Amino acid sequence: MTNIRKSHPLMKIVNHSLIDLPAPSNISAWWNFGSLLGLCLGIQIITGLFLAMHYTSDTLTAFSSVTHICRDVNYGWIIRYLHANGASMFFICLFLHVGRGIYYGSYTYSETWNIGILLLFAVMATAFMGYVLPWGQMSFWGATVITNLLSAIPYIGTDLVQWIWGGFSVDKATLTRFFAFHFILPFIIAALVMVHLLFLHETGSNNPTGIISDADKIPFHPYYTIKDALGFLFLITLLLTLVLFSPDLLGDPDNYTPANPLNTPPHIKPEWYFLFAYAILRSIPNKLGGVLALVLSIAILAVMPLLHTSKQRSMMFRPISQCLFWVLVADLLTLTWIGGQPVEHPFIIIGQLASFIYFFLILILMPTCSLIENKLLKW
């Protein structure tokens, strides 16, 4: 009798995706982040569903409903903090996943890469709208500042902003629609993940050497299922440590003050995972220029396959490119730090320099160094 996992129409799909999937024998722990992102998405959807059962998307009761979840709902506090800190874990895994893609040249699978960029935009949009929901000071002012950026779009800007707000300012209509979008987007993300995996399984996984590994494949189960399980254990341990020992470490104290349109906080800043993009936005004095730079800071990933000039796919054997990659990482950390600082000297000039270096590295330095490395191969 044929094994059910190989004959049943539904089990066959699961089998080809998670059990008998041929995987390269040499993929390192850097390949764990895909499954960890799946775990994060699962945690966020489940905790979010339970939070939505008690949350009210009304300006008068939103803040107190979050307080009610933490104080009166059974284990509401842990659900709320798992959701808030789960978002941070999600972005840590996302950044490491994208970083691994850049380092090992995974962007040459352009369909998978482009769906990944769409996923990144969708997750960022979801996180932004989720941050508005508790209706604290930073929620309200963050929503006001970021949505207001759309007014920089010529001709339609002002109308577009008022259309998104549902009025002439961030108010009840804005909060209600943000809640609706925040609820539906994770399911759209889950669908995009399926497409992401569909394209990935068309080509098979990349590996650290960047060399085609068809001659040396091993089954995904048990080798990589056990490896992923260890990753899950690490992630859950880290998340629970954060939630149970310092749940507010990554949050903003201003968000424990109910939203007040008449009182602007001294420093309006987004969550830590948006600070690098926020720093790029602030580094350009022109409003429209800043908005374009903000969008391009992520959209620039889409041109990476076009800028790949090296004869080798991975950076594993390209020391000059490796140095530039780590300069890029340091630059992004600098931008993250700058994004959380007030707009004053010397932070303004540091932010402008770091923003320039970010685009200069990706668009000019890295492709040029790849060409130099091609020449060095002939020596």
UniProtKB/Swiss-Prot annotation:
Cofactor(s) the protein requires to work: heme b
Residues bound to a ubiquinone: 201
GO molecular function: metal ion binding; ubiquinol-cytochrome-c reductase activity
Biological process terms in GO annotation: mitochondrial electron transport, ubiquinol to cytochrome c
Domain of life: Eukaryota
Membrane topology, record value: Multi-pass membrane protein
Coiled-coil annotated residue ranges, if any: none
InterPro entries noted in UniProt: Cyt_b/b6_C, Cyt_b/b6_C_sf, Cyt_b/b6_N, Cytb/b6-like_sf, Cytochrome_b, Cytochrome_b_C_euk/bac, Cytochrome_b_N_euk/bac, Di-haem_cyt_TM
Residues given in the record as heme b b566 binding sites: 97, 196
Main location: mitochondrion
Pfam families noted in UniProt: Cytochrom_B_C (PF00032), Cytochrome_B (PF00033)
Keyword Transferase: no
PROSITE patterns linked: CYTB_CTER, CYTB_NTER
UniProt keyword terms in alphabetical order: Electron transport, Heme, Iron, Membrane, Metal-binding, Mitochondrion, Mitochondrion inner membrane, Respiratory chain, Transmembrane, Transmembrane helix, Transport, Ubiquinone
Residues binding heme b b562, per UniProt: 83, 182
A GO term from the CC aspect: respiratory chain complex III
The record's free-text note on cofactor binding: Binds 2 heme b groups non-covalently.
Locations listed in the record: Mitochondrion inner membrane
Transmembrane region(s): 33-53, 77-98, 113-133, 178-198, 226-246, 288-308, 320-340, 347-367
Function: Component of the ubiquinol-cytochrome c reductase complex (complex III or cytochrome b-c1 complex) that is part of the mitochondrial respiratory chain. The b-c1 complex mediates electron transfer from ubiquinol to cytochrome c. Contributes to the generation of a proton gradient across the mitochondrial membrane that is then used for ATP synthesis.
Note: Heme 1 (or BL or b562) is low-potential and absorbs at about 562 nm, and heme 2 (or BH or b566) is high-potential and absorbs at about 566 nm.
Subunit structure, as described in the record: The cytochrome bc1 complex contains 11 subunits: 3 respiratory subunits (MT-CYB, CYC1 and UQCRFS1), 2 core proteins (UQCRC1 and UQCRC2) and 6 low-molecular weight proteins (UQCRH/QCR6, UQCRB/QCR7, UQCRQ/QCR8, UQCR10/QCR9, UQCR11/QCR10 and a cleavage product of UQCRFS1). This cytochrome bc1 complex then forms a dimer.
Family: Belongs to the cytochrome b family.
Identification of the protein by name: Cytochrome b
